[in-house]
């Protein structure tokens, strides 16, 4: 499109250019045209050929333009000047060779002077500076002096002092002019260049401004900053502009180097007088910076320094150059201007890097940046720039040449941005000029020197005080202006972050590490001290740099310190300085906070590397959790500490490692530390692409072992001195000294190397899966990539600078920097064995990273970094330190507790040889106790720490005197807070169970302090009232033989012994007062429980033990028989009554938990009822008090908690009534003759009836007993059931339950008082007899035998010798007539004349089931020898009348044979005679003597009234009766003479349903079996029923028949299964020494002798196969042969003893585990040296865990661990010390109360009597049969007539085809009155006409006969009575299993199964 002109045109223009006749303007125009149409080389040739013409044109046009501009400034004139300047630039650029020889030097200097005039416009002057620099660099060193002077004036306002005499060639002197040959003419002094008017040469005109500034341009005074900026920019713009003929690139660089050198020589000393040219990075001077002040004079030129810094950073900042290169190379048609600009930048950078002087200049410029004073915004930005440059140098991929090591090969060619450079930008000549010589190696200073220089120089930003500067800087937010302090703070944060980047990511040598440490120490010391002392005391922390950055500075210092010791050996003198600095700054809270973070993190690493335990993922926290299995499948790094058992790489291993790291990274971060997944030095908001650093691999990858830097730098601190712990512990064991190891000194560690195999070394995450040297590098690189892309490796700092706010959120990732800590170098060798032999750096070896020895040493050193913590001046910081020490100690305790934990819970691991130094800080604790009162808070923490050490057994024999002395002084001192702290943290009785040598010396001190606390009114959660009560309670029940009489005298200043024989009496007084007036609920409960224990012990041991040997080590109170009485000579403690009265008074407490605890404590004594009876009036006191408490606790609207209290009281009352001997209960105790039984029944009746009291019951008067609780600290525990609100329904439920309990207790007492246990034993309260027992012999003559455990009982349903009654709503009676049973010796009727049948009555009620066998008694043995003569006759003609059966004697005389007295004679008793009727005579006497009493219609009182019937009617009735009598006599005679089948009439024709042949056969057989008796099968039962008065009309409303059916029998079986007592089942587990896993514990088949004694004392052994009581779900076979069992009249307990159950197979182990795991209460006997844990036998149950630990002194430590939802219970509290005499009793009572409390807390839980009552109600509501009196009487006469029997048989026969729905719909329908049909059928035979009523009933039955029985389908429902295989005493049978028995098996009840408790 555009073309240049032809060659001919160029020639024409050239000719015109050379034509001197043309005007200069035309020639200039032709010259421009020529240059526009030729190449640059041709242009240069043109200029060189016509240089004279060209310069003439320049000068002429310039002079013309100057002249025109002087006249008037016009646009055309400015254009003329622009053309001249264009030509000037062309001459300067194209003729450098001529100009270098000073061609036209003077002329050009005049032009330049005019252009540089200060009066010119700024634009023109900038152009002039550029032209001058082009000319000046061309002249170079050949420039004359005046040119150099012109250069010195380039910056206006900057005065450059003249440096002495100017050189001889710079100017011409006057003499030179005069002596010059040209100045002389012929014979005279005249000259053309000489003015004759004057005597001197011609002078040049004055230089004036060419183009003054316009009015729009400001005429401000010149600013040196602007001039310097113009100069520096022009230096860059003029670079590479000269077109040299040869060696252009070299000359370009030389030209710029000249300008730069001139700049440094001329201007730099002027505006930066502090610029130190002697500073060198090749031999750096590393003097530590000091505090500096702000000099106002220096601030004047600071802006110029800022300009220089910004200018240098443009060419040394890698990122800026990369940006230019990227922009240039991505454009195809590169613009020459842009390309030229890029070349200029490269030239500048190359010149800056070309030699050492220039490189030093660059670093000195940046040093000046760090010395700026934050007084302006540009200064702040310059500092930021300097920091960014150094950061990019350290992290960039292409380092500058001075960063390269002098001996290393140059790095592979690559540019900063990652894009290959174009080769055309680097010509061969350029490469040869710059990098082709050995000079390039000279500039290499090495990375370490640069790092040292930066570390030293950058510290200057901290060392200037800007807090007093009253300056504000604008920000992006218009509403906020920042201050110099804020800006300095941000800059310091950036420097700290760069320091951290170096620590984390940069390889540094020893000198660099030490310099960094020294600089940080200097900064820490100066900044924090300076801010502390120069500001007023009340200054806010945010007003000082140290206050803002104190935490960050301390953290950086500490982390760098620890990191350095894992990388390089550090001079010991630095440690001393470090300690001095930290100790001098202990008044700063930031130091304490960071020190604590360091210690806590070091403790984690210490735990991980030394003991193989991750504190953030403890083994105890993982046990018994499902997630633990997943973690174990992934693999725990810490378990194979010295092995090489990890997976061999691969993706699975990498994924596992990544997951572990991510979990640890998240877990170890705290709220104050932000964990970032990609950066361990967090720099938020500026993400940087991830780079893999070759330096992080150690700088090389050629055969050497790579040292992982970047990915390994993210671990946490660790704690230590444990390499020595193993060795020292072995030494102590050899010397038989205390087993607690102590850390050795580092010198000892260095001298005595331990065996590497003894250390449990933990391999790092990145050192997994390495087998040999061949795989080493790849494995590491995999680890690096994993770490970099994952979560734990620190990335480089962000690309665009560090955010100022990152420090606060970052905290240097102290966990990360120490937790990883190059541990890979520890496990990165060819195998673990080779690595374990290497010594760590801190011990003088070469192994980097964390090792057990390095972690232990570093942990101990950092622990002591603060020096003596008791010298901390501030009390609050002193307390804070001890609080942190306590946290650290608790972590050490966790480590100890988690050592040797089995991961699979199948085998117990041996204890490791290393033990954490728990007591390492004990000396500090003792020292703190001697401080003054202002340090009280710290002393409290120290006391807690000491007590924790004592509890953990970390107080050795050497420390015990100090420990006792400290406790003695504090316990007897005046400071109650310290006293309370000791009592609280000694954990009450835990101190007694520790068995510390000589601990009994402190008993009186403890009692004294406890009395002070309990008598105080201070009630809060921090006051240890409960712990003190438990301690005193344990001492109260302490065996006197173990209490030494010598104790310390309770005075603070004395340490003397005294005798105290009455210590326990003193304790008893305190406990009694606590039980009476304690304001804390929990302490009151504990005191009451301890009083109960004391009572039990005193009743069990009435006399003190005469011998104190081991004979009394373990005495148990085994339950004894009721006939065993205590010795009469027993003497009981006289204070038993006083203690009893306190317990009885507590029964009236309205606080429900306290009342229940009092009940439980009192119930302990119920087992000692006979001992209590031996004490005068104690039984009356107890019974009366309980009855009174019942009345007081009764409320009109009870809640669930009231119900629990009242039921507990009533059951306790029942227990005492059963325990106290019956004679005492039946003995009157007052004048009215009331007995205790009467009083009890009266109260129970009142409760059961719910009768309101007419008078208010008042509490028992006791002025010393406080019924109020000021502090209910039981709120946090589980609560008794309590509804949020009450409704009438909930109130009624509670009332019903309370009444039912009273009824059950009263019935129990009526039945069992004086009889328990009966002959069957204590395991059975109810009869085991059932309806089917002995029926087979009675009904079938022995042909068919029914079995007890059979559910298929059709014979029971159809038996005619049995009837079921409901005598009232809660009483079901079964009357069964049986043949007289043959008993050994004749039984109770031996020798008496009885009938050959007996009556069995089974009664089921709330109290259980009772069985009574009754026989009719005819005569005594003497009468039986002479039987009456009428006996044979009666036997053959005995009527069916039930009353006649008893007439075995002569009938009395008839009524009319009696004599009568005269009417006026008074019948007296002395005149009685057998034939006189006293009542008849009395009536006659009254009527005779008092006629007014005789009615008008009656003549006398003893005469009958007139009959309402007529005489005929009376005669008719008499006739019917006589006929009936005659018929009966004939029937008897007929049946006796002809013994035919009695029920022959059943086969007669009838319209009713006929019975089947089976029923006829069974009925016939039943009568044939009685050949000697012909009475009905139910005859004697009917007789007894009448004798008992049950047949009377007055009882008709309460007595009902029950519908006989199989469902009823099942319901009765269900009633029998309901327990009549409270039942509990508990697990008993034995843990032998060395057992801590489930497998070994469950495999125990026996225990120690003490354990066996304990188990035997819990109850008595029962045989599971023959036991007839509660079994707790144990099968009779398969779970052992015996089990311990215990029973009282109101409860049963069975123990699932693990050692009794077999464990020889996996099935047996599974069964054992199920039985034990399903128990709610576990009793564990542990002889292991560590505490038993719940997770050893994991289960969803085990709500309460009771563990017994035998102690060496014969006592037992008991811990009670309950789940949070379980309410408080007694008598044993957690951490109790109990003697062996009452151990089993207390454990049993505690376990029972625990089970009872757990159940009471369950919603909708019902007691045993409620369950039984519900079953009885179910029977009465479902099966009660409403009948008329006639029907009722008939069913008594004949329980099962043939009609009913047939109907029942037919319904059973047809049941197989009927659906279940019919049974569900019709099961409540009334049965057919079959007995009516039987009487009708028997009418013709008997000769009796059926009555009308009987006929109508029969007709009704006939009409409904076919539909009366509801058919039932064959489906069976799962019910509690489902047929199962059961063990019978004679043989083992299976019911309902065969096919043949299917027809006789009745269907199961369609009702749903009821809930059962076993």
Curated annotation (Swiss-Prot):
Biased composition (Acidic residues): 775-785
Protein's recorded name: Probable Rho GTPase-activating protein CG5521
Stretches the record annotates as Disordered: 1-21, 400-424, 635-804, 1534-1568, 1903-1958
Presence of the UniProt keyword Ribonucleoprotein in the record: no
Rap-GAP domain sequence ranges: 1612-1819
PANTHER family: RHO GTPASE-ACTIVATING PROTEIN CG5521-RELATED (PTHR10063:SF11), TUBERIN (PTHR10063)
Modified residues (Phosphoserine): 718, 764, 767, 787, 791, 793, 795, 1551, 1949
PTM sites of type Phosphothreonine: 1945
Biased composition (Low complexity): 640-656
Keyword Cytoplasm: no
Superkingdom assignment: Eukaryota
Biased composition (Basic and acidic residues): 758-774
InterPro entries: ARM-type_fold (IPR016024), Rap/Ran-GAP_sf (IPR035974), Rap/Ran_GAP_dom (IPR000331), RGPA/RALGAPB_N (IPR046859), Tuberin/Ral-act_asu (IPR027107)
Keyword annotations of the record: GTPase activation, Phosphoprotein
Positions carrying Phosphotyrosine: 980
Compositional bias per record (Pro residues), positions renumbered to this chain: 400-414
Biased composition (Polar residues): 788-800, 1546-1568
Record-level GO BP terms: regulation of small GTPase mediated signal transduction
GO cellular component labels: cytoplasm; nucleus
Taxonomic classification: Eukaryota, Metazoa, Ecdysozoa, Arthropoda, Hexapoda
Disulfide bonds: none
């Amino acid at each position: 499109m555009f073309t240049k002109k032809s060659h001919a045109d160029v020639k024409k223009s050239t000719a015109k250019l050379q034509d001197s006749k043309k005007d200069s303007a035309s020639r200039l125009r032709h010259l421009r045209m020529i240059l526009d149409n030729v190449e640059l080389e041709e242009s240069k040739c043109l200029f060189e050929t016509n240089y004279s013409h060209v310069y003439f044109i320049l000068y002429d046009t310039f002079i013309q333009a100057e002249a025109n501009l002087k006249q008037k400034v016009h646009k055309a004139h400015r254009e003329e000047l622009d053309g001249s300047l264009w030509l000037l630039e062309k001459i300067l650029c194209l003729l450098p060779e001529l100009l270098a020889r000073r061609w036209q030097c003077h002329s050009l200097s005049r032009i330049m002077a005019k252009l540089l005039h200060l009066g010119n416009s700024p634009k023109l002057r900038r152009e002039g500076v550029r032209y001058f620099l082009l000319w000046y660099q061309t002249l170079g060193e050949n420039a004359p002096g005046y040119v150099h002077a012109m250069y010195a004036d380039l910056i206006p306002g900057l005065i450059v002092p003249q440096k002495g005499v100017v050189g001889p060639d710079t100017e011409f002197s006057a003499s030179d002019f005069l002596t010059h040959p040209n100045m002389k003419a012929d014979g005279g002094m005249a000259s053309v260049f000489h003015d004759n008017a004057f005597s001197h040469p011609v002078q040049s005109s004055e230089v004036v401004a060419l183009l003054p500034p316009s009015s729009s341009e400001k005429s401000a005074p010149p600013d040196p900053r602007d001039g310097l900026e113009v100069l520096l920019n022009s230096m860059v713009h003029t670079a590479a502009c000269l077109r040299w003929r040869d060696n252009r690139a070299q000359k370009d660089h030389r030209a710029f180097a000249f300008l730069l050198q001139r700049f440094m020589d001329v201007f730099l000393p002027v505006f930066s007088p502090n610029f130190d040219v002697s500073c060198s990075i090749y031999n750096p001077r590393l003097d530590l910076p000091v505090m500096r002040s702000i000099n106002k004079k220096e601030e004047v030129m600071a802006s110029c320094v800022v300009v220089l810094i910004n200018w240098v950073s443009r060419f040394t900042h890698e990122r800026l150059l990369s940006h230019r290169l990227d922009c240039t190379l991505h454009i195809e048609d590169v613009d020459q201007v842009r390309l030229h600009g890029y070349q200029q930048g490269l030239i500048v950078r190359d010149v800056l890097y070309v030699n050492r002087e220039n490189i030093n200049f660059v670093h000195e410029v940046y040093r000046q940046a760090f010395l700026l004073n934050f007084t302006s915004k540009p200064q702040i930005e310059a500092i930021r720039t300097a920091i960014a440059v150094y950061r990019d140098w350290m992290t960039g991929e292409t380092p500058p040449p001075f960063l390269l090591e002098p001996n290393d090969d140059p790095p592979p060619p690559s540019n900063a941005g990652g894009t290959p450079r174009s080769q055309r930008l680097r010509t061969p000549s350029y490469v040869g000029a710059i990098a082709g010589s050995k000079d390039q190696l000279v500039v290499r200073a090495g990375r370490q020197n640069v790092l040292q220089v930066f570390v030293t120089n950058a510290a200057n930003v901290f060392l200037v005080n800007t807090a007093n500067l009253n300056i504000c800087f604008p920000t992006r937010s218009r509403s906020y202006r920042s201050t110099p302090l804020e800006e300095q703070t941000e800059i310091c944060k950036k420097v700290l972050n760069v320091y951290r980047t170096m620590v984390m990511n940069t390889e540094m040598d020893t000198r660099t590490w030490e310099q960094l440490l020294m600089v940080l120490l200097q900064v820490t010391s100066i900044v924090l001290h300076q801010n502390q002392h120069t500001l007023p005391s009340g200054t806010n922390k945010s007003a000082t740099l140290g206050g803002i950055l104190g935490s960050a500075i301390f953290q950086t210092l500490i982390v760098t310190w620890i990191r350095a010791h894992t990388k390089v050996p550090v001079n010991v003198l630095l440690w001393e300085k470090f300690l001095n600095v930290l100790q001098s700054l202990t008044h700063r809270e930031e130091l304490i906070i960071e020190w604590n973070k360091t210690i806590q993190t070091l403790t984690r690493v210490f735990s991980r590397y030394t003991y193989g335990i991750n504190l953030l993922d403890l083994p105890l926290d993982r046990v018994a959790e499902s997630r633990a299995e997943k973690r174990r499948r992934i693999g725990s790094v810490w378990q194979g500490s010295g092995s090489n058992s990890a997976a061999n790489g691969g993706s699975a291993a990498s994924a596992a490692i990544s997951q572990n790291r991510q979990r640890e990274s998240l877990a170890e971060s705290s709220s104050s530390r932000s964990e970032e997944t990609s950066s361990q030095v967090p720099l938020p908001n500026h993400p940087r692409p991830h780079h893999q650093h070759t330096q992080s691999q150690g700088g090389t990858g050629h055969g050497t072992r790579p040292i992982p830097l970047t990915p390994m730098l993210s671990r946490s601190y660790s704690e230590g001195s444990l390499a020595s712990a193993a060795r020292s512990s072995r030494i102590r064991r050899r010397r038989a000294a205390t087993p607690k190891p102590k850390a050795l000194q580092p010198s000892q560690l260095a001298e005595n190397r331990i065996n590497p195999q003894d250390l449990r070394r933990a391999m790092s995450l990145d050192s997994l899966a390495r087998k040999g040297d061949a795989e080493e590098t790849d494995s590491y690189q995999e680890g690096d990539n994993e770490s970099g892309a994952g979560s734990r490796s620190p990335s480089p700092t962000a690309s665009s600078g560090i955010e100022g706010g990152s420090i606060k959120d970052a905290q240097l990732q102290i966990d990360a920097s120490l937790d990883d800590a190059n541990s890979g170098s520890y496990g990165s060798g060819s195998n673990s064995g080779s690595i374990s032999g290497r010594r760590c750096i801190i011990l003088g070896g070469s192994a980097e990273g964390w090792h057990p020895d390095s972690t232990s040493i570093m942990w101990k050193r950092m622990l002591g970094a603060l020096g003596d913590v008791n010298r901390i001046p501030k009390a609050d910081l002193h307390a804070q330190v001890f609080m942190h020490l306590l946290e650290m100690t608790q972590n050490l305790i966790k480590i100890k507790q988690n050592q040797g934990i089995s991961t699979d819970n199948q085998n117990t691991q041996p204890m490791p040889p290393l033990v954490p130094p728990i007591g390492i800080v004990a000396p500090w604790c003792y020292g703190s106790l001697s401080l003054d009162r202002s340090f009280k808070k710290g002393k409290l923490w120290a006391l807690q720490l000491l007590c924790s050490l004592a509890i953990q057994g970390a107080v050795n024999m050497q420390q015990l005197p100090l420990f006792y002395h400290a406790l003695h002084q504090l316990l007897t001192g005046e400071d109650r807070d310290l006293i309370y702290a000791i009592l609280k943290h000694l954990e009450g009785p835990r101190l007694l169970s520790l068995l510390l040598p000589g601990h009994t010396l402190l008993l009186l001190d403890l009692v004294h302090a406890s009395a002070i606390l309990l008598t105080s009114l201070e009630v809060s959660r921090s006051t240890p009232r409960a712990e003190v009560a438990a301690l005193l309670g344990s001492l109260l029940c302490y065996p006197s033989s173990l209490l030494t009489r010598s104790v310390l005298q309770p005075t603070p200043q004395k340490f003397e012994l005294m005798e105290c024989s009455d210590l326990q009496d003193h304790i008893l007084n305190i406990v009694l007062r606590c039980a009476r007036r304690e304001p804390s609920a929990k302490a009151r409960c504990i005191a009451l429980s301890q009083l109960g224990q004391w009572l039990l012990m005193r009743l069990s041991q009435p006399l003190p033990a005469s011998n104190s040997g081991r004979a009394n080590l373990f005495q148990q109170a085994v339950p004894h028989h009721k006939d065993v009485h205590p010795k009469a000579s027993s003497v009981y403690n006289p204070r038993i009554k006083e203690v009893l009265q306190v317990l009885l008074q507590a029964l009236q407490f309205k606080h429900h938990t306290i009342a229940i605890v009092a009940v439980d404590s009192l119930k302990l004594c119920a087992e000692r009822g006979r001992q209590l009876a031996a004490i005068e009036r104690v039984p009356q006191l107890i019974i009366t008090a309980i009855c009174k408490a019942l009345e007081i606790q009764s409320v009109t609207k009870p809640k669930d908690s009231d119900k629990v209290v009242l039921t507990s009281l009533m059951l306790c009352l029942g227990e005492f009534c059963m325990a106290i001997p019956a004679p005492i209960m039946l003995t009157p105790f007052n004048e009215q003759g009331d007995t205790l039984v009467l009083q009890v029944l009266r109260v129970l009746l009142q409760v059961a009836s719910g009768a309101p009291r007419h008078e208010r019951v008042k509490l028992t008067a006791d002025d010393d007993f406080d019924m109020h609780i000021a502090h209910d600290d039981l709120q946090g525990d589980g609560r008794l059931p309590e509804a949020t609100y009450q409704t009438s329904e909930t109130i009624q439920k509670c009332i019903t339950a309370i009444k039912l309990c009273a009824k059950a207790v009263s019935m129990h007492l009526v039945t069992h008082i004086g009889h328990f246990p009966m002959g069957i034993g204590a395991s059975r309260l109810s009869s085991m007899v059932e309806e089917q027992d002995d029926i087979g012999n009675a009904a079938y003559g022995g042909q068919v035998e029914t079995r007890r455990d059979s559910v298929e009982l059709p014979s029971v349903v159809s038996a005619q010798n049995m009837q079921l009654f409901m005598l009232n709503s809660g009483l079901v009676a079964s009357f069964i007539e049986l043949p007289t049973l043959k008993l050994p010796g004749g039984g109770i009727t031996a020798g008496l004349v009885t009938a050959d049948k007996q009556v069995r009555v089974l009664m089921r009620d709330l109290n259980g089931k009772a069985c009574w066998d009754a026989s009719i008694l005819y005569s005594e043995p003497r009468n039986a020898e002479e039987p009456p003569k009428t006996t044979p006759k009666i036997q053959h003609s005995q009527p069916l009348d039930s009353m006649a059966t008893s007439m075995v004697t002569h009938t009395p005389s008839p009524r009319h044979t009696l004599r009568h007295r005269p009417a006026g004679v008074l019948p007296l008793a002395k005149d009685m005679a057998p034939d006189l009727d006293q009542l008849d005579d009395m009536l006659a006497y009254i009527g005779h003597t008092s006629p007014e009493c005789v009615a008008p219609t009656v003549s006398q009182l003893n005469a009958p009234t007139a009959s309402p019937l007529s005489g005929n009617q009376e005669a008719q009735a008499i006739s019917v009766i006589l006929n009936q009598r005659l018929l009966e006599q004939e029937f008897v005679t007929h049946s006796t003479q002809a013994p035919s089948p009695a029920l022959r009439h059943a086969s007669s024709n009838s319209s009713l349903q006929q019975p089947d042949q089976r029923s006829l056969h069974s009925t016939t057989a039943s009568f044939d079996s009685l050949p000697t008796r012909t009475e009905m099968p139910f005859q004697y039962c009917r007789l007894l029923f009448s004798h008992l008065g049950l047949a009377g009309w007055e009882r008709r409303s309460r007595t009902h028949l029950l519908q006989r059916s199989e469902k009823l029998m099942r319901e009765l079986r269900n009633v029998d299964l309901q327990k009549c007592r409270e039942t509990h089942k508990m697990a008993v587990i034995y843990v032998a020494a060395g057992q801590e896993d489930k497998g070994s514990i469950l495999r125990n088949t026996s225990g120690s002798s003490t354990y066996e004694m304990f188990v035997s004392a819990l109850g008595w052994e029962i045989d599971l196969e023959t036991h007839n009581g509660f079994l707790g779900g144990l099968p009779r076979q398969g779970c052992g042969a015996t089990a311990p069992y215990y029973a009282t009249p109101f409860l049963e307990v069975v123990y699932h003893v693990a050692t009794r159950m077999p464990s020889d197979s996996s099935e047996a182990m599974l069964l054992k585990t199920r039985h034990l795991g399903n128990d709610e209460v576990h009793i564990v006997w542990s002889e292991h040296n560590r505490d038993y844990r719940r997770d050893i036998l994991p289960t969803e149950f085990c709500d309460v865990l009771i563990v017994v630990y035998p102690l060496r002194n014969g006592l037992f430590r008991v811990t009670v661990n309950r789940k949070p939802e379980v309410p408080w219970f007694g008598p044993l509290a957690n951490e109790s010390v109990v003697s062996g005499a009452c151990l089993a009793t207390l454990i049993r009572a505690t376990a029972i109360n625990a089970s009872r409390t757990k159940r009471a807390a369950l919603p909708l839980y019902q007691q045993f009597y409620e369950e039984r009552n519900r079953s009885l109600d179910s029977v009465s509501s479902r099966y009660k049969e409403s009948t008329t009196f006639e029907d009722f009487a008939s069913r008594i006469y004949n329980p099962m007539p043939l009609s009913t029997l047939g109907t029942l048989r037919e319904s059973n026969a047809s049941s197989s085809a009927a659906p279940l729905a019919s049974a569900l719909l019709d099961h409540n329908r009334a049965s057919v009155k079959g007995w009516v049909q039987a009487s009708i059928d028997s009418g013709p035979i008997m000769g009796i006409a059926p009555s009308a009523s009987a006929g109508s009933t029969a007709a009704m039955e006939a009409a409904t006969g076919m539909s009366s029985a509801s058919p039932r389908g064959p489906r069976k429902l799962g019910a509690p009575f489902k047929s199962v295989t059961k063990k019978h005493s004679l043989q083992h049978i299976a019911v309902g299993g065969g096919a043949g028995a299917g027809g006789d098996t009745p269907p199961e009840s369609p009702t749903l199964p009821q809930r059962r408790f076993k």
